[in-house]
Amino acid sequence: ITRRLGGSLMTALIAFIAVFVLATSLAVVASLENGLRLSRERLGADIMVLPAGASGNASEVLFCAEPVNVYLPADVERTVAGIDGVEQATPQFFTQTVNQSCCSVIGVTRVVGIDMKTDFIVGPWLVGGTLEGGALPPDGIILGAAAPPIEGGQASILGSVFYCVGTLEPTGSSVDETIFMDVNAARTIAAESPYLESVWLNVDPFDAISCVMVKVKEGAQPSAVAAAIIEQVPGAA
């Protein structure tokens, strides 16, 4: 009986060790897969669609375009999203703070409006992987790793008060110096700013975007997709 009991205990111990090793291996594999997935997500955009005549800094294309005061119609995003070879497309709307009493942020700082429903540029870099409350509210802002400090968690930007709901990990790109907010909030403060009145003489900010960031499908050639975009989207470059 003692031998049988000892044999059973040994068998149980071996089985436990085997299960433990398997579970540990699976955890390591899952961790590696999550790391690879996050790395893929953080690669940013393959193509940046800008209005013709706007210059883009190639070193910034993967993450965030340089802000320019020229625009594309908002429906360009839908057109681009439907082009063969496009996996994801998300719009951005640029504005900026000014060195005036309407802005508590020190210095002139890039402000980029994003659509969190389609965004794949900012989300993967969020500290903690998510926003406070799980969404980007109309009065919420996300700070790049090197954006100007916000006193008390809130800032006045072009006359409107915003609250910090998230921060980004360092990217080594212009994203680090950028303040992000909801795309419609960015349009609203830009439209109401007396410092930007001349920009909107011929453009409706609520029907405008600054660029479309594009990620191509696996196996698709970015150059071919870019050529198709230029062909199908008048005024794009």
Where does each model-flagged region fall?
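Hydrophobic, regular-secondary-structure patches
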Residues: F20, T24-V108, L136, A227-E231, ...
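Hydrophobic secondary-structure segments that place a key small or acidic residue at a functional site
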Residues: Q92-T95, S104-K117, I121-S198
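Short, flexible, solvent-exposed loop/turn segments with mixed acidic/basic and small polar residues
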Residues: T11, T130-E132, V199-P205
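N-terminal Sec/SRP start-transfer signal
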Residues: I1-A23
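Mechanotransmission and gating elements of multispan inner-membrane complexes involved in transport
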Residues: T167-A237
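A conserved hydrophobic position in a structured secondary element of the catalytic/binding core
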Residues: L50-P51, L72, I114, L143, ...
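Membrane-interface junctions
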Residues: R3-G7, L38, P170, E218
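Short acidic/His/Gly/Ser-rich catalytic and metal-binding motifs that mark active-site loops
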Residues: S55-S59, F120, K217
